[in-house]
Amino acid sequence: MRVIGGTLKGRRLFSPRWAGLRPTSDRLRETLFNVLGARVEDTRVLDGCAGTGAVGIEALSRGAEHVVFVEQDPRAVALIRRNVAHCELTDRCTIRRAALPAALGRVPVESFDLVLLDPPYGAS
């Protein structure tokens, strides 16, 4: 897993070492941010169900001003902290351990220019 574009292009990110967390693929992130283009620059972003933090880190790499990561799994929160520190982005983000609905109840939606959600999905 790596950062696809922007100032951190090519930077490797740490991946989960446990089952159940499926990071957003590099290809999907590349497609998403190619569509968004320059609209990411100078924005405040919510990365909900943040998992590894890869989506929010990609936004920061491409010029987002600030990202709020929301994740309820404590292992994933630790992984986000590790990835953010590895990318030297701690001053440009906030990391909250909470379920997304609870976190949204405490943060005005107007606080964000862009909301990115990649919730977990069931597997059979």
State the predicted function of each range.
Residues M1-S124:
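Class I S-adenosyl-L-methionine-dependent methyltransferase catalytic core
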